[in-house]
């Protein structure tokens, strides 16, 4: 089949780079822009979607990004995303302004540029959930301000 004019806009098999905090038996997750921009796309984007099926601390240390990040925590039942069988602990802010938020429902979190955030700890997982992030940047690594948290 001949290449079409718009083929570059269809990214097939967008597998993500395995995060160092990932349990060894974790399923591969999907993601784009983790280590390199998507070839042929004009807008910068990094995105990850991964199943969470057991408790673990994904990101143990706080970090910042040079741009905003959107995190999402979604119930794993595709017929009822409101069914959220997990408890997630997520920290935003630093020092006396640090707040620990407990996520027990399908939730989106906007993290402004420069705001210290994490640890991210999946404390209880009774049923699988989906976790992901979106950033309008050419790569995830390009946005880290300071030392890498993982």
Label each PLM-derived region with a short phrase:
Residues 1-15, 120-150:
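Double-stranded beta-helix
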Residues 100-123:
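Conserved metal-binding segment of the jelly-roll/cupin
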Residues 71, 108-110, 133:
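Conserved hydrophobic/aromatic beta-strand scaffold that supports enzyme active sites
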Residues 73-104, 142-145:
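A short beta-strand-loop-beta hairpin characteristic of the jelly-roll/cupin
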Residues 54-58, 63-75, 86-88:
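Short basic alpha-helical hairpin corresponding to helix-turn-helix/winged-helix-like nucleic-acid-binding
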């Amino acid at each position: 089949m001949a290449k079409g004019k718009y083929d570059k806009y269809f990214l097939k098999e967008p597998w993500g780079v395995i995060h160092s905090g990932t349990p060894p038996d974790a399923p591969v997750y999907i993601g784009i822009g983790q280590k390199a921009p998507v070839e042929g796309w004009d807008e910068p984007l990094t995105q990850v979607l991964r199943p969470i099926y057991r408790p673990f601390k994904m990101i143990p240390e706080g970090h910042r990004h040079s741009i905003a990040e959107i995190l999402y925590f979604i119930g794993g039942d595709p017929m009822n995303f409101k069914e959220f069988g997990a408890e997630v602990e997520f920290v935003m802010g630093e020092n006396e302004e640090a707040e620990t938020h407990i996520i027990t429902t399908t939730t989106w979190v906007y993290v402004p540029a420069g705001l210290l955030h994490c640890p991210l700890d999946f404390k209880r997982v009774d049923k699988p959930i989906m976790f992901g992030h979106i950033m309008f940047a050419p790569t995830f690594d390009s946005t880290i301000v300071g030392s890498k948290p993982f």
